[in-house]
A protein has these predicted regions:
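Accessory beta-strand-rich segments of carbohydrate-active enzymes
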Residues: 1-135
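Edge strands and adjacent loops of beta-rich recognition modules
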Residues: 152-174
């Protein structure tokens, strides 16, 4: 089971496959009060040996343009952007239970690697800009060489996370 959230929006990948079944995860929230997370059962996607978990993270509601934001002068510079913050962030916990009864939790931390990919801009209102020349083939597969990527910078802890987000059909995102 993997639990994931973002200050912004994310698209979760495991072993080269997209895990996230919805767009704009984890969903809108007033980031000053709460942050939702989603839980995904990835049991069938885990493989023996090495696995690779990663995410594409974008501004979303956290630091992107908000509806009517520019017209109403929202945000620190009255541009309609950065209403809640400037830098998107991602958090994940992968819970693994082995057949012998032992378990392991893999957390996002400074051992994770980050880079800029082909999505050079991704905003809910301004749209996405995609530069295919910057594609990173195989970036979420085991053995990918990310040695030229930067180390992730851990975000400061918040007061806590809310219960899992449910989509509009009332089902838990799994």
């Amino acid at each position: 089971l993997v639990h994931a959230t973002a200050l912004g929006i994310y698209d979760l990948h495991l072993n080269g496959e997209r895990v996230t079944g919805n767009y704009f995860a984890p969903g809108w929230t007033d980031y000053r009060r709460s942050v939702y997370y989603n839980s995904y059962d990835v049991t069938s996607r885990l493989q023996e040996g090495s696995n690779c978990l990663g995410a594409v993270v974008a501004d979303g509601w956290y630091s992107g343009y908000l509806p009517s934001g520019k017209a109403k002068g929202y945000g620190p510079y009255r541009t309609g952007r950065n209403m809640y913050g400037k830098n998107p962030a991602f958090l994940a916990q992968l819970h693994i239970e082995y057949e012998d009864g032992t378990s392991q939790i893999v957390l996002t931390d400074s051992s994770w690697k980050v880079t800029t990919g082909p999505e050079t801009a991704a905003d809910l209102l301004a749209g996405e800009q995609y530069d295919a020349r910057k594609e990173l083939a195989g970036w979420s597969t085991p053995g990918y060489d990310a040695s030229k990527w930067n180390d992730a910078i851990p975000a400061t802890k918040s007061k806590g996370l809310n219960p899992p987000f449910s989509d509009k059909t009332g089902t838990r995102a799994t």
